[in-house]
């Protein structure tokens, strides 16, 4: 018998804007998606995957290899097979359908990274409704790597906030960032220095804003690991955030521990 349901929110983005015009390839990271999802299932919970358009997330090719699984080819193949074949990953819902149903059936929400959320999830109105619901009820909200940027979907004008970040309009960013429900929360996110090798090796250009700046401007208290790409997870009230791809196992452990505490309390 399942101990509860966890909503996993994926991105449908495949391209991200780069400075000077044009776009670069992006998507969702395989390990960031499947490592926590598989761990949650192994711990006795169900997983439901939802995206803006109801289609399976596009896996960023930069993540689609064994290097993100400690060089373990068998672990990578298990992860790939799970994503490609398991009903929890292939029976994808739309975010709107999730909102239209009973949100109280979910014990937690989890948003993995890759740069995809920077394109669609951070300005998705339906995700904003979901995250506001979870925040108001102090329900577990976990986000990994670029995933924490999706919390900005809860702003009254999330699209305008993103546009102001791209335009570099600091005054507008400050104005539209007021009243964010996570202001004052301790959190982490993919760092500006960690972004550089991604920009150089895969995007061949710079994105318009950094993740720490975007969260910090709205009032997030952003911290980071002492060394780039070292695992780092921050937990503050209902919010659990992980800094980078290597934080996949640690955030899974924190998420499961929080779920188990909530199950006992219930």
Q: Predicted segment positions?
A:
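Short, thiol/selenol-centered motifs that function as redox-active sites or metal-ligating centers
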Residues: 144-148
